[in-house]
Amino acid sequence: DAIDSLKFLRFITAVAARCGQMVNAAEIARDADINQTQAKDWLTILETLGIIFYLHPYSNNLLKRLVKTPKLYFYDTGLVCYLTKWSSAETLECGAMNGAILENYVVAEIRKTYLNCGKEPYLYYYRDKDAREIDIVLEHDGILNPIEIKKTANPGTELVKVFELLDKASTPRAKGAVICMKPGLSAIDRDNYIVPVWII
């Protein structure tokens, strides 16, 4: 009925406002004025319909103190912008959600690229109890590729220091990348690339 439709709109808007964040059903339920069970059920519906997906935390028996909560992303960043009322690219550029929506876009595009090729995307994120985080950990062929996503045109070497956290894992770390607003492909150092967003 109409009341349920309004509740669902509030719900999906609350979900969109949290794209790129760790899932918190209690907060979503509070903002949508529904209970947690309903919020979890509706999240399942969104996932089943291919509207959202989860990025699970990377885990390894040699890495300690890792978080266990997945992060939530939308396949369509245009839907996120519509629901969170960003009317143009110009207003979003200066808005509070620009970093989150850029991250959502990059993660979704990488995932869709794998799926469109008929491959399973082994994508994760890294976050420990000290809030140290790597946006994407790509696992393939027995190696890990760490990726940071930043809304900057001039990424510095400090952005890739966090990649060293993966060196304690049993799976070896390979080349990393910072995906950012720089127009051309280049290197940040001998082990890490600077990749412009438009390439993905």
Q: Locations of the language-model features?
A:
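Switch/connector loops and helix/strand junctions flanking conserved nucleotide-binding motifs
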Residues: 81-82, 156-158, 185-189
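Arginine/glycine-rich "motif VI" loop of SF2 helicases in the C-terminal RecA-like domain
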Residues: 115-116, 164-173
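Active-site ExK catalytic segment of metal-dependent nucleases
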Residues: 139, 145-154
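Short, hydrophobic beta-strand segments that form beta-sheet elements in well-ordered domains
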Residues: 172-180
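Conserved beta-strand segments of alpha/beta enzyme cores
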Residues: 122, 175, 191-193
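Active-site-adjacent loop/helix micro-motif of nuclease/hydrolase catalytic cores
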Residues: 153-163
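Accessory nucleic acid-recognition modules appended to NTPase machines
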Residues: 1-144
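Domain-level recognition of nuclease-like catalytic cores that cleave nucleotide substrates
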Residues: 182-200
